[in-house]
UniProtKB/Swiss-Prot annotation:
Top-level enzyme category: translocase
Site (Required for activity): 363
Upper lineage: Eukaryota, Viridiplantae, Streptophyta, Embryophyta, Tracheophyta
Catalyzed reaction equations: ATP + H2O + 4 H(+)(in) = ADP + phosphate + 5 H(+)(out)
Record note on quaternary structure: F-type ATPases have 2 components, CF(1) - the catalytic core - and CF(0) - the membrane proton channel. CF(1) has five subunits: alpha(3), beta(3), gamma(1), delta(1), epsilon(1). CF(0) has four main subunits: a, b, b' and c.
Family membership: Belongs to the ATPase alpha/beta chains family.
Predominant location category: plastid
Pfam families hit by this protein: ATP-synt_ab, ATP-synt_ab_C, ATP-synt_ab_N
NCBIfam families on file: atpA (TIGR00962), PRK13343.1 (NF009884)
Protein's UniProt name: ATP synthase subunit alpha, chloroplastic
PROSITE patterns in the cross-refs: ATPASE_ALPHA_BETA
Keyword Protein transport: no
């Protein structure tokens, strides 16, 4: 039998006492009182912060939104089917944040930045708060560089600049998403990173957008954030902020970004649902009182940064759906007042075959020609004026049968200009092609053609000038101006192609 000496025992005890580490963990916990409809009411959690993440016993995460005197209203970031009444909840001490990195490019993720495209995990070393403050006045500079959409009607008359917020508004099925996706396609080779946020849409619609971007190689510079119609309201409400956080990551790294929110009406509806279930008082159209703040704090994050911060930019194209053209409803008026202009898509124009169905009369860009190259300013002014006069004359001509020759000519010119603005989906044009197209129309070269021949002629003209007069594109891209030399090359090219075209049509 081994005998232990007393001093050995005391040494062992001393060592153990020295190794003892007194660690006290204070956890702020509470108990579930009630759960249902994506909302949980928690008793306890006395020191929880507004917007703090809380974790339920079975692993679901929630956000503490309502801090009341006797309980806390938590919105769930999941279905919460396994949460039981009386189970415990603990505060995490964290606010919602997502991992960010270049590896997100080309991926489809959800509002929590988890991949949903079945292509494995995304590696990220940094993270950003989902809700971070917008850049201040000193951090910004005014918008001065163009962001080309590839659509003649927009780039000439409603120009968008890098760092601008331009609302796309219209009824359902008027081509709002098509305008947004065309803009993404047109950013190829422009060093612009695109983020497309789909909120409360059909999964089939999102899949269609992703497929069209993949087919044209646009997913290489695009991130898709999707929360479909079957997602919890909390995640639909968070999705735009997740997209903004990803775009901000690139903006602060001196890059240009474009973010599309498709659409903010659905986000407002999700927020209304959450607010009513949390028993917040309803306001106009049953939306809560802070629905304006919901959108303003999101859209204010779009900016053109100052030269000290690297001149990165984040351009936002929010989409809002109207009911039978009513732009005076609550959400449309809110977003119109926050943004720097709106592109109004009309169902009547869409049904009349004018696509993109942009109503140029009430669409406006408040940044205006500051975001256009000089060559575009030179040709776009005349186009705007002629179309405005045509719209006025067309309304007048309906009541009068005997019109003088000058009026008839102006109406004929207007019809051809309207034809010139029509474009197929997913066929964006370069700025040089747009300039030559507008110049052809405003200088009367299309007046001798039948309306049905206009688009065919313009397609052939663009091909002819690209192959036979490459110097025109070179002058425009290098000087950004329609110089006398460029104009004479263009005139020559149009004359040659017009003669060839008329000859072909006669045969």
């Amino acid at each position: 039998m081994v005998t232990l000496k007393a001093d050995e025992i005391s040494n062992i005890i001393r060592e153990r006492i020295e190794q003892y580490n007194r660690e006290v963990k204070i956890v702020n916990t509470g108990t579930v009182l009630q759960v249902g409809d994506g909302i949980a009411r928690i008793y306890g959690l006395d020191e929880v912060m507004a917007g703090e993440l809380v974790e339920f016993e079975e692993g679901t995460i929630g956000i503490a939104l309502n801090l009341e005197s006797n309980n806390v209203g938590v919105v769930l970031m999941g279905d919460g089917l396994m949460i039981q009444e009386g189970s415990s909840v603990k505060a995490t001490g964290k606010i919602a944040q997502i991992p960010v990195s270049e590896a997100y490019l080309g991926r489809v993720i959800n509002a929590l930045a988890n991949p949903i495209d079945g292509r494995g995990k995304i590696s990220a070393s940094e993270s950003r708060l989902i809700e971070s403050p917008a850049p201040g006045i000193i951090s910004r500079r005014s918008v001065y560089e163009p962001l080309q959409t590839g659509l003649i009607a927009i780039d000439s008359m409603i120009p968008i600049g890098r760092g601008q917020r331009e609302l796309i508004i219209g009824d359902r099925q008027t081509g709002k998403t098509a305008v947004a996706t065309d803009t993404i396609l047109n950013q190829e080779g422009q060093n612009v990173i695109c983020v497309y946020v789909a909120i409360g849409q059909k999964a089939s619609s999102v899949a269609q957008v992703v497929t069209s971007l993949q087919e044209r190689g646009a997913m290489e510079y695009t991130i898709v954030v999707a929360e479909t119609a079957d997602s919890p309201a909390t995640l639909q409400y968070l999705a735009p902020y997740t997209g903004a956080a990803l775009a901000e990551y690139f903006m602060y790294r001196e890059q240009h970004t474009l973010i599309i929110y498709d659409d903010l009406s659905k986000q407002a509806q999700a927020y209304r649902q959450m607010s009513l279930l949390l028993r917040r008082p309803p306001g106009r159209e049953a939306y809560p009182g802070d629905v304006f703040y919901l959108h303003s704090r999101l859209l204010e994050r779009a900016a053109k940064l100052s030269s000290q911060l690297g001149e990165g930019s984040m351009t936002a194209l929010p989409i809002v759906e109207t009911q039978s053209g009513d732009v005076s409803a609550y959400i449309p008026t809110n977003v119109i007042s926050i943004t720097d202009g709106q592109i109004f898509l009309s169902a009547d124009l869409f049904n009349a075959g004018i696509r993109p169905a942009i109503n140029v009369g009430i669409s406006v860009s408040r940044v205006g020609s500051a975001a256009q190259i000089k060559a575009m300013k030179q040709v776009a002014g005349k186009l705007k004026l002629e179309l405005a006069q045509f719209a006025e004359l067309e309304a007048f001509a309906q009541f009068s049968s005997d019109l003088d020759k000058a009026t008839q000519n102006q109406l004929a010119r207007g019809q051809r200009l309207r034809e010139l603005l029509k474009q197929s989906q997913s066929a964006p044009l370069t700025v040089e092609e747009q300039i030559m197209t507008i110049y052809t129309g405003t200088n009367g070269y299309l007046d001798g053609l039948e309306i049905g021949q206009v688009r065919k002629f313009l397609v052939q003209l663009r091909t002819y000038l690209k192959t036979n007069k490459p110097q025109f594109q070179e002058i425009i891209s290098s000087t950004k101006t329609l110089t006398n030399e460029a104009e004479s090359v263009l005139k020559e090219g149009i004359q040659e192609q017009l003669e060839r075209f008329l000859l072909q049509e006669k045969l």
